[in-house]
Amino acid sequence: MAGWAGFELSALNPLRTLWLALAAAFLFALLLQLAPARLLPSCALFQDLLRYGKTKQSGSRRPAVCRAFDVPKRYFSHFYVISVVWNGSLLWLLSQSLFLGAPFPNWLSALLRTLGATQFQALEMESKASRMPAAELALSAFLVLVFLWVHSLRRLFECFYVSVFSNAAIHVVQYCFGLVYYVLVGLTVLSQVPMDDKNVYVLGKNLLIQARWFHILGMVMFFWSSAHQYKCHVILSNLRRNKKGVVIHCQHRIPFGDWFEYVSSANYLAELMIYISMAVTFGLHNLTWWLVVTYVFSSQALSAFFNHKFYRSTFVSYPKHRKAFLPFLF
């Protein structure tokens, strides 16, 4: 009974509950969109909170009260500025702790304890044999935090030097959520590091010898997925540029090439694969991170559904074999 009680307590920590709630909310919203039209909520605000960019423009004329809360879609770059700074800081603190034995600041330890207290275990209760998985988990969290920072840095670069933003908008609620999102993701990664009070279990000198097959596979998958996402964003950008790379319009065109041959939102599919690569890096059995992946799947699938609907209603010649998000399936 004590074992089950401990499992239930760890399974219901605030962090997992939050990601589960977000995943369930977006999955429910997706199922509503797939339901018959008569079952869809008629509230304009509900639809406005779900859509952004071109899918927001493609609907019927939006009420003035909705337009009053518009934020330019180009403000996406703000999300990645915050992520680079915040998650870069978390990566620095984790590196200091792993390689120099420096404790986390009091405020960070308190925050992590609040979000996921199950990571704090008494060292005296751990046998020498059981510290090996803890060391592997520490390496996993370190690598995933590196991946998250690299991903954010690349996306920030793309916002400034690759993407061509139109005058499309996002809702201010979506904007505020985006500002908080990468802060929460970084804390989620850090909360998986095995710790005793403020000190990380494993020092860096023993960290690299903990590398396992899933660390290597996760790294390969991450860079493979990132390369495809970058290529997809270049394809989308080139639709608005001439052969010299000069922006000539901000209209929408049908993308071709790479994963766009299979799905309408290839960049969203790549985003999902990036998060799955992080789940692999965690050893495929980290429940908290799989809840994050479930949220990413639900939110990206919803956006992909709207994109697919936009393309099919806008372009008569749109390829009929393409799916919205998952090749050959959805």
UniProtKB/Swiss-Prot annotation:
It is found in: Endoplasmic reticulum membrane. The chain crosses the membrane at residues 17-37, 81-101, 133-153, 170-190, 207-227, 278-298. Its EC number is 1.3.1.94, 1.3.1.22. Residues 38-80, 154-169, 228-277 are lumenal. It comes from the Eukaryota. Keywords: Endoplasmic reticulum, Lipid metabolism, Membrane, NADP, Oxidoreductase, Transmembrane, Transmembrane helix. Disruption phenotype: Death by 12.5 dpc. At 10.5 dpc, embryos are smaller and fail to undergo axial rotation observed at 8.5 dpc in wild-types and present dilated hearts and open neural tubes. Its main location: endoplasmic reticulum. It holds the Pfam family Steroid_dh. It is a multi-pass membrane protein. It is an enzyme of class 1 (oxidoreductase). Pathway: Protein modification; protein glycosylation. It catalyses: a di-trans,poly-cis-dolichal + NADP(+) = a di-trans,poly-cis-polyprenal + NADPH + H(+); a 3-oxo-5alpha-steroid + NADP(+) = a 3-oxo-Delta(4)-steroid + NADPH + H(+); androst-4-ene-3,17-dione + NADPH + H(+) = 5alpha-androstan-3,17-dione + NADP(+); 17beta-hydroxy-5alpha-androstan-3-one + NADP(+) = testosterone + NADPH + H(+). Residues 1-16, 102-132, 191-206, 299-330 are cytoplasmic. GO terms for cellular component: endoplasmic reticulum; endoplasmic reticulum membrane. One of its GO terms (molecular function) is polyprenal reductase activity. GO terms for biological process: dolichol biosynthetic process; dolichol metabolic process; dolichol-linked oligosaccharide biosynthetic process; polyprenol catabolic process. The keyword Hydrolase does not apply. Plays a key role in early steps of protein N-linked glycosylation by being involved in the conversion of polyprenol into dolichol. Acts as a polyprenal reductase that mediates the reduction of polyprenal into dolichal in a NADP-dependent mechanism. Dolichols are required for the synthesis of dolichol-linked monosaccharides and the oligosaccharide precursor used for N-glycosylation. Also able to convert testosterone (T) into 5-alpha-dihydrotestosterone (DHT). Belongs to the steroid 5-alpha reductase family. Polyprenal reductase subfamily. This is Polyprenal reductase. The lineage of its organism: Eukaryota, Metazoa, Chordata, Craniata, Vertebrata.
